[in-house]
């Protein structure tokens, strides 16, 4: 579960693992894109922990993608 206070790379790893477990192809790419959508920046460049709103948005996007909703529909 993605929570407020998580560091960006830890959040992306968590999302990637969940997507992989759900059978989503390209889970690493999808996790990075979902982070970018939720946080508004690239996880590789971000260094501040996730805020509450960012974490909630990333969690919601992850749940939708894990349910196999196409990434393009989430953008």
Annotate the PLM regions.
Residues 1-26:
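Non-catalytic nucleic-acid substrate-recognition regions in nucleic-acid-modifying enzymes
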Residues 28, 33-75:
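Conserved AdoMet
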């Amino acid at each position: 579960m993605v929570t407020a206070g998580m560091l960006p790379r830890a959040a992306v790893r968590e999302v990637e693992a969940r997507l992989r477990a759900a059978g989503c192809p390209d889970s690493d790419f999808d996790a990075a894109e979902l982070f970018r959508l939720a946080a508004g920046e690239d996880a590789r460049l971000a260094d501040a922990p996730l805020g509450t709103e960012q974490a909630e948005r990333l969690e919601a996007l992850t749940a939708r993608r894990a349910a196999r909703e196409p990434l393009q529909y989430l953008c």
